[in-house]
Swiss-Prot record:
InterPro entries documented for this protein: Ribosome_maturation_RimP, RimP_N, RimP_N_sf
Subcellular location(s) per record: Cytoplasm
Family: Belongs to the RimP family.
GO term, biological process aspect, one: translation
Role: Required for maturation of 30S ribosomal subunits.
GO cellular component: cytosol
Protein name per the record: Ribosome maturation factor RimP
Keywords on record: Cytoplasm, Ribosome biogenesis
Amino acid sequence: MIKYFDKNNEVFNLIKDLTGRLNVEILEINIFRNKNNGKIQIVLYSKNFSLDIDFLTDLHKMILLILEANLKYGFTLELSTPGIDRKIKSDREFKIFEGKKIKLMLDNEFEEGFILESKPKSFIFKTDSKEVNVFYSDVKKARLV
């Protein structure tokens, strides 16, 4: 089942302006906390350029400065990219990955095709033989190919 991306996430709101200026999309944020420390994992993507190690190292420093100035607990920060066969986890990712080839499971088997267009509650899925409007609520699984 596809989730709706939580734009009320504190970390998202602290870093979205920076990543937006750099043409980098925030795909996912995971926060693990116990009493006074935690771990923040952020998955990033750009349609325009490759997020190489040098870029991610510089971006890590910038994000770390923002988060350390605003969060009241200690944490470690991990940045990563989505990988070749990423599972699509939120409605927002269908917009980000428009034009990309995916494997989609609606019933009990996968079908390959492309994300033609993303809409607020659905997306257009194109295979070799058809184009269909798919509601996010009907998606059992989806991943990049």
